[in-house]
From Swiss-Prot:
Catalyzes the reversible phosphorylation of S-methyl-5'-thioadenosine (MTA) to adenine and 5-methylthioribose-1-phosphate. Involved in the breakdown of MTA, a major by-product of polyamine biosynthesis. Responsible for the first step in the methionine salvage pathway after MTA has been generated from S-adenosylmethionine. Has broad substrate specificity with 6-aminopurine nucleosides as preferred substrates. Also catalyzes the phosphorylation of 5'-deoxyadenosine (5'dAdo) to 5-deoxyribose 1-phosphate. Part of a bifunctional DHAP-shunt salvage pathway for SAM by-products. GO terms for molecular function: S-methyl-5-thioadenosine phosphorylase activity. Its EC number is 2.4.2.28. One of its GO terms (cellular component) is cytosol. Pathway: Amino-acid biosynthesis; L-methionine biosynthesis via salvage pathway; S-methyl-5-thio-alpha-D-ribose 1-phosphate from S-methyl-5'-thioadenosine (phosphorylase route): step 1/1. NCBIfam families: MTAP, PRK08931.1. Belongs to the PNP/MTAP phosphorylase family. MTAP subfamily. It is an enzyme of class 2 (transferase). Phosphate binds at S16, R58, H59, S91, A92, T190. This is S-methyl-5'-thioadenosine phosphorylase. Disruption phenotype: Mutant cannot release methanethiol upon 5'-methylthioadenosine (MTA) feeding. Deletion mutant accumulates both MTA and 5'-deoxyadenosine extracellularly. It comes from Rhodospirillum rubrum (strain ATCC 11170 / ATH 1.1.1 / DSM 467 / LMG 4362 / NCIMB 8255 / S1). Homohexamer. Dimer of a homotrimer. The gene is mtnP.
Length: 294
């Protein structure tokens, strides 16, 4: 990774209800092209308390993209091209646990990927890589997020398994009960393959899963109005903005590379012999894997 990446640049991917960042100095929407296709939207650039920030609305402004229609590869590639070194991924989820009521923020540290209609890797024919996903998120970044949530007195849980489904329909009762048997804590539609791609791009990634309601396993599920869910969604969005505003102070002394390995996840991952690597693929991966491809 070049010297340009030594200074932290915090990327924020906003999910349902979070479409911008308040208080950015020098705020401007910037188009970033990606060889992997269309990015969800322009990237909002600026500084917050001296920290460079880059915000991307996952579903586009106005929420025009369904989870299956988001080009996750283009989004992560564009954030890497924008200089992002850490990603705070904010998304709305349903709860699969009684002790995670609406309004709780879960710093998920594991995922089960049940998506099936999405491109899940930057690598492929002509340039093959296998990145470890045993620990898919940055423990260091998760620690900083946990500190902020505690400071703000936002109900939260550190650790948990995020079940990512394809959508756009919600789960059946049988599926919801199955995921609970698997030990999952929250269910959503967007953090896979997002977390996998951030790992491949050597960007430290932290999920903040904001519980809006209980999934359909819960006996009260059918009695909760849409208005109540929307109210929690908006309250969560306000809390998420408070979280983002407090993050710069936690990142100013960020070590490089991070001790959890997030900035070095491609070490020994590429297995295609240098003489056999596809030049076109290598050019396409110039941002994602430039550190190891040279």
């Amino acid at each position: 990774m070049s010297e340009a990446y030594r200074q932290p640049v915090l990327g924020v991917i906003g999910g349902s209800g979070v479409y911008d960042i308040d208080g950015l100095e020098g705020a401007r929407w910037q188009t970033v092209e990606s060889p992997f296709g269309d990015v969800s939207d322009q990237i909002l650039r600026g500084t917050l308390d001296g920290l460079e920030m880059a915000f991307l609305p996952r579903h586009g402004r106005g929420h025009v993209l369904a989870p299956s229609d988001v080009n996750y590869r283009a989004n992560i590639d564009a954030l890497k091209r924008a200089g992002v070194t850490e990603i705070l991924s904010v998304s709305a989820v349903g709860s699969l646990a009684e002790d995670l009521p609406p309004g709780t923020f879960v710093i998920a540290d594991q995922f089960i990927d049940r998506t099936f209609a999405r491109e899940k890797s930057f690598f492929g024919k002509g340039l093959v890589a296998h990145v470890s996903m045993a620990h898919p998120v940055s423990a260091w970044l998760g620690d900083r997020v946990e500190e902020v949530l505690a400071d703000l007195a936002i109900p939260h849980r550190r650790g948990g398994t995020y079940l990512c489904m394809e959508g756009p329909q919600f789960s059946t009762l049988a599926e919801s009960n199955l995921y609970r048997q698997w030990g999952c804590h929250v269910i959503g539609m967007t953090n896979m393959p997002e977390a996998k791609l951030a790992r491949e791009a050597e960007i430290a990634y932290c999920t903040v899963a904001m519980v809006t309601d209980f999934d359909c396993w819960h006996p009260d599920h059918d009695h909760v109005s849409v208005e109540a869910v929307v109210r929690v969604l908006l309250q969560n969005a306000d809390k998420a903005r408070s979280l983002v505003k407090a993050m710069p102070a936690k990142l100013k002394d960020r070590p490089y590379p991070l001790p959890d390995g997030s900035h070095r996840s491609l070490d020994n991952a590429i297995i295609t012999h240098p003489d056999r690597r596809n030049p076109g693929m290598a050019r396409k991966l110039s941002a994602v894997a430039g550190r190891v491809l040279g």
